[in-house]
């Protein structure tokens, strides 16, 4: 799915006109490659180290198992090319950079000058948080952050998106008779939906539990300390992206899966290093990069512009609900709410832009 979105973005930005691509597959070797404005050659074998080693750049959206199987073999063969990857497998390696160029372009340029060859996309939620709050991190105003996330089905995969829609349909069908009865009581509708979610017949092979009409308050593995792996990534990856591994900012929170299709949302609480007026903070956020848009902290604007429905399929990362909160009179605390497309800035776009950076370096 990330690969499909990456292809769409490369078409839209005319990237294919700048490169000579070869396409690889683990399951459809020899079949015709994708149409890229012209016919492409048959698909090559993605398990062939020899064929991969002929590439100057490999862009992988195949997942961590593939990376763990092929990457060591490819490097062991003597390949000196650039590896760009959506998977998490290599993110925390010392010889890899997590790429988010609007935020860490200086880090990327420094790595290129030092001969670093591995450039990895970050965790979707972490990347979207850093894009939205870039202005505060850039100004070194952040002492710590907590993020309460509302994560879309797309973060779990394409089949999870399909299952979410099936669950929605299943719940509707279960309550349909009560819903369409003009004299019916809403409690009858509620009872029918609740029964559908609990009776074991709801499609749940992917999630394991109901998401439609419910939520999942745990994402990824249990680290055994009360924290999920998804929650751990915020501080680990966030500080690596910011180049602060030697002086890490505390970043933590609770990650929750909800019934949105492809946009992650986050409610943030930030402790600031110094007190600033809200209008100055909003200006910093708005000017940090061209994709952030500050939404006025007003009811209508928030409901219209600060939702997955409004943002899905766009590169915009709106930030709203920005206000001070009185947790402690001796310090300055801020709340904010941000939304972003998990498949764009959360996955495909940093990879696409890293490829363009390499092309610029080569030229």
Please state what every model-predicted region is.
Residues 58, 153-363:
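Charged docking surfaces used in two-component/phosphorelay signaling
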Residues 1-206, 246-250, 317-318, 322-328, ...:
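N-terminal Rossmann-like NAD(P) cofactor-binding subdomain of oxidoreductases
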């Amino acid at each position: 799915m990330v690969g499909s979105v990456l292809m769409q973005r490369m078409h839209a930005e005319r990237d294919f006109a700048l490169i000579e691509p070869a396409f690889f597959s683990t399951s459809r070797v020899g079949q015709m490659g994708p149409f890229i404005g012209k016919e492409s050659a048959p698909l090559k074998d993605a398990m062939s180290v020899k064929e991969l080693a002929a590439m100057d750049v490999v862009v992988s959206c195949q997942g961590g198992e593939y990376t763990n199987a092929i990457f060591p073999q490819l490097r062991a063969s003597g390949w000196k090319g650039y590896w760009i990857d959506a998977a998490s497998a290599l993110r925390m390696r010392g010889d890899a950079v997590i790429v988010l160029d609007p935020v860490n372009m200086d880090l990327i340029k420094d790595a290129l000058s030092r001969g670093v060859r591995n450039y990895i996309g970050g965790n979707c939620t972490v990347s979207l948080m850093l894009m939205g709050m870039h202005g505060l991190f850039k100004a070194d105003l952040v002492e710590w952050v907590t993020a309460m996330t509302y994560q879309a089905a797309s973060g779990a995969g394409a089949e999870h998106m399909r299952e979410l829609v099936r669950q929605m349909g299943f719940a509707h069908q279960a309550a349909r008779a009560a819903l369409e009865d003009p004299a019916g009581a809403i409690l009858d509708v509620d009872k029918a939906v609740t029964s559908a979610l609990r009776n074991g017949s709801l499609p749940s092979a992917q999630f394991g539990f109901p998401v439609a009409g419910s939520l999942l308050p745990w994402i990824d593995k249990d680290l055994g300390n009360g924290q999920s792996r998804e929650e751990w990534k915020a501080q680990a990856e966030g500080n690596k992206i910011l180049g602060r591994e030697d002086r890490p900012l505390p970043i933590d929170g609770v990650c929750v899966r909800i019934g949105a299709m492809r946009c992650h949302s986050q409610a943030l609480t930030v402790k600031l290093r110094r007190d600033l007026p809200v209008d100055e903070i909003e200006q910093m956020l708005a000017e940090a990069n061209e994709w952030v848009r500050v939404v006025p902290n007003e009811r209508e604007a928030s409901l219209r512009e600060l939702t997955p429905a409004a943002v899905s399929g766009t590169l915009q990362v709106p930030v709203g609900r920005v206000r001070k909160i009185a947790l402690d009179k001796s310090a300055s605390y801020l709340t904010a709410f941000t939304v972003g497309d998990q498949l764009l800035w959360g996955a495909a776009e940093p990879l696409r832009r890293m490829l363009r950076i390499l092309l610029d370096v080569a030229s």
